[in-house]
UniProtKB/Swiss-Prot annotation:
The active site is at 63 (proton donor). It comes from Caulobacter vibrioides (strain NA1000 / CB15N). Pfam families: OMPdecase (PF00215). One of its GO terms (biological process) is 'de novo' UMP biosynthetic process. This is Orotidine 5'-phosphate decarboxylase. Catalyzes the decarboxylation of orotidine 5'-monophosphate (OMP) to uridine 5'-monophosphate (UMP).
Length: 233
């Protein structure tokens, strides 16, 4: 069985050397990797370039969030990296700046709607007058208006996001869902998790599945188990 390009494995590991070792262990079972903030300060871009050179796809999950001018300058540099996906926060000014900077490059911009670790109670505590579902709906509509390529949301809001995108005439809109947990794994700190099959049926285009794979005794075997769950959907 070969890798499924819809499966993204996050390299949320302490060091770049740890990440390289994990990639080696996973071998041909995984073709798409996410590099997040943990590796940003320790040559994460060097790792990204090396993985791209070896034929892997790369998701830079850096969640850019700053004034428009700063986001635009940062995204313009990243657009030359050859990486495939970049996250920004789902605020109109931020999304517009990233889309402008991306230009004609192959980099696709994803807007982060609501973190999968947050509950409705958390949002109230943060001062939002929305449930997670309502806030995701608002941000998906804003993301479509700003011209980003897709969004990041929990599997529980994937069907809503897909419906909104289809109604807007954008069936190709990307929906990347973290918080994917196979039935045989623990949920960890994901408050709104779902199985790989359920997330895909809800309309997700890509799944981010981390600890069930990277913390397994045999990461390659765990990755192939997830790929098997995804097969045919």
């Amino acid at each position: 069985m070969t890798a499924d390009p819809r499966l993204i494995v996050p390299l949320d590991l302490p060091t770049v050397d740890d990440a390289r070792a994990m990639v080696e262990r996973l071998g041909d079972a995984v073709s798409f990797y996410k590099i997040g903030l943990e590796l940003l300060a320790s040559d994460g871009m060097g790792l990204a370039h090396d993985l791209k050179a070896s034929g892997k796809s790369i998701f830079l999950d850096w969640k850019l969030h700053d004034i428009g001018a700063t986001v635009e300058r940062s995204a313009r540099v990243l657009a030359t990296s050859g990486c495939d996906l970049l996250t920004v926060h789902a605020e109109p000014q931020v999304m517009q700046a990233a889309v402008k900077a991306r230009g004609d490059s192959s980099l696709k911009i994803l807007a982060v709607t609501v973190l999968t670790s947050l509950t409705d109670a958390d949002l109230v505590e943060m001062g939002y007058a929305f449930t997670a579902r309502d806030l995701v709906e608002r941000r998906v509509r804003q993301a479509l208006a700003c011209g980003v390529d897709g969004i990041v949301s929990s599997p529980h809001e994937a069907a809503l996001a897909r419906e909104i995108a289809n109604d807007a005439g954008q069936p190709e809109f990307l929906i990347v869902t973290p918080g994917v947990r196979p039935e045989w794994s623990a949920k960890n700190d994901q408050a709104r998790a779902a199985t790989p099959a359920d997330a895909l049926r809800a309309g997700a285009t890509h799944l981010v599945c981390g600890r069930p794979i990277t913390a397994a005794n045999d990461p390659r075997e765990a990755a192939l188990k997830v790929v098997t769950e995804m097969a045919g959907i």
